[in-house]
């Protein structure tokens, strides 16, 4: 938010050629504030799948994080797990840990549920989540995993790279990922991404940088550093990430997560999701 406001204030005098951020909701919002210029090139279109970039070319995803279920291998049989909506059912009462509704990742996930299942069903799901909470929502995904390890809850929802970092440090931690919604919409994914600023003084070079960032070489670096999935799906994954297996992604265009963000916030406020 602060950087977007700064770019708006700087206008034509901005020194920034590229704006980069960590969530499609933020990228979409930046697009509504008229700080990007449209960049549609054959290189970016061939490297990055259509659902991971703005339909008008304002921004493109550069790395992918899936937001899925993490569970205690000591207390949960994976056959009990299935979907995001299943976590709203009675069997998870007092066993669920979630991240606060104030965080952009939560807003984007709920926005995707509104898009895929409608406002009424989304309300039912989020209401069930709130009823099933074992504790006040956490500030960070790492805190959710800490709470599961401490026995405070049995299941949670996290971005995959947080799990990757934990497993890198503690390979024998009794936690596993479960890919949600594999028989329906697929796992909700989000991106970190970037776009060329409207008043970029080095626009041609900025476009070249964006193209390079979408390339196999850059994507391999990007993914391995943060335990994320490459947005360019023509390259192999980091070793830790590969160990989690393949999964079906939700192919909703991520600009929709931005458009429905305000609806997601209102829904969560109405249900007192902290």
Predicted regions and their residues:
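A structural signal for short loop-to-beta-strand junctions that line the ligand-binding cleft
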Residues: 14-19, 37-69, 85, 95-98
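Ligand-binding pocket segment of bilobal, Venus flytrap-like solute-binding proteins
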Residues: 101, 105, 112-180
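Periplasmic-binding protein-like
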Residues: 48-50, 64-65, 94-102, 126-130, 137-138, 212-236, ...
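Ligand-binding "clamshell"
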Residues: 30-38, 50-57, 166-180
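Early extracytoplasmic/lumenal segment of secretory-pathway proteins
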Residues: 1-28, 274
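A bilobed periplasmic-binding-protein/Venus flytrap-type ligand-binding module shared by bacterial periplasmic
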Residues: 68-75, 189-202, 221-224
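An extracytoplasmic/periplasmic, membrane-proximal ligand-sensing/linker region
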Residues: 120, 228-274
């Amino acid at each position: 938010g602060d950087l977007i406001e700064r770019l708006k204030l700087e206008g034509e005098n901005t020194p920034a050629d590229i704006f980069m951020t960590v969530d499609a909701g933020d990228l979409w919002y930046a697009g509504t504030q008229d700080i990007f210029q449209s960049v549609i090139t054959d290189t970016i279109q061939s490297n990055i799948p259509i659902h991971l970039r703005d339909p008008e070319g304002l921004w493109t995803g550069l790395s992918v994080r899936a937001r899925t279920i993490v569970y205690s291998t000591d207390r949960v049989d994976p056959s009990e797990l299935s979907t995001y909506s299943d976590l709203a059912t009675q069997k998870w009462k007092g066993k669920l840990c979630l991240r606060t509704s104030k965080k952009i990742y939560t807003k984007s996930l709920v926005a995707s549920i509104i898009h895929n299942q409608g406002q009424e069903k989304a309300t039912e799901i989020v209401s069930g989540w709130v009823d099933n909470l074992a504790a006040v929502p956490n500030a960070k995904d790492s805190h959710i995993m800490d709470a599961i390890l401490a026995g405070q809850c049995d299941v949670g929802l996290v971005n995959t790279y947080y799990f990757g970092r934990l497993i890198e440090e503690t390979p024998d931690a009794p936690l596993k990922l479960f890919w949600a919604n594999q028989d329906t919409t697929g796992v909700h994914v989000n991106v970190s991404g970037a776009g060329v600023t409207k008043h970029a003084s080095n626009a041609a070079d900025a476009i070249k940088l964006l193209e390079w960032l979408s390339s196999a070489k850059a994507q391999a670096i990007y993914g391995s550093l943060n335990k994320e999935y490459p947005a360019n799906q023509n390259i192999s994954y980091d070793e830790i990430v590969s160990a989690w297996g393949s999964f079906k992604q939700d192919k909703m265009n991520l600009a929709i997560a931005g458009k429905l963000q305000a609806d997601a916030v209102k829904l969560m406020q109405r249900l007192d999701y902290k």
